[in-house]
Amino acid sequence: MYFCGYMKNSINIKNRKAKFNYEFLDKYTAGIKLAGTEIKAIREGKANIAESFCEFNNHELFVINMHVEEYSHATHFNHNPRSQRKLLLQRRELRKLEKEVTNSGLTIIPLRLFINDRGLAKLQISLAKGKKLYDKRETIKDRESKRRLDRIQKEYK
């Protein structure tokens, strides 16, 4: 199957809040079960994973609250923008993730939505542990001190 050059790796939607709110443990790349209009909207870049999370239902993993805008050129047979979408992983990965989530109280967060070289939509997910408030404050302090140092170094060059 041949795809145009503009489509290759052109879509890269990130969850920027996740890095600040969570500490990542393991990362996985999962396929997504999508309708025709959903993949077309994603290829246009009209998706948002900022407030989404993953949840198990009957030993299957679903991404919840991922917003995929309705496809502009579709007729009345369009998709629901906030519907649950099934994630496709290998069985052993699913078992491992489900065990970690139920026993350790960890959560699964989507990090990045992208189109791979074969033109398929993939979702990079991570097993994550929520940061405490003081950890978030420390992250902010570190970032500000790094910016300050960079500014000072720039002045003396």
Swiss-Prot record:
PROSITE patterns: SSRP. GO terms for biological process: trans-translation. One of its GO terms (cellular component) is cytosol. GO terms for molecular function: RNA binding. It is found in: Cytoplasm. InterPro entries: SmpB, SsrA-bd_prot, SsrA-bd_prot_CS. Keywords: Cytoplasm, RNA-binding. It comes from the Bacteria. It holds the Pfam family SmpB. The keyword Cell wall biogenesis/degradation does not apply. Its main location: cytoplasm. Belongs to the SmpB family. Required for rescue of stalled ribosomes mediated by trans-translation. Binds to transfer-messenger RNA (tmRNA), required for stable association of tmRNA with ribosomes. tmRNA and SmpB together mimic tRNA shape, replacing the anticodon stem-loop with SmpB. tmRNA is encoded by the ssrA gene; the 2 termini fold to resemble tRNA(Ala) and it encodes a 'tag peptide', a short internal open reading frame. During trans-translation Ala-aminoacylated tmRNA acts like a tRNA, entering the A-site of stalled ribosomes, displacing the stalled mRNA. This is SsrA-binding protein. It comes from Christiangramia forsetii (strain DSM 17595 / CGMCC 1.15422 / KT0803). The lineage of its organism: Bacteria, Pseudomonadati, Bacteroidota, Flavobacteriia, Flavobacteriales.
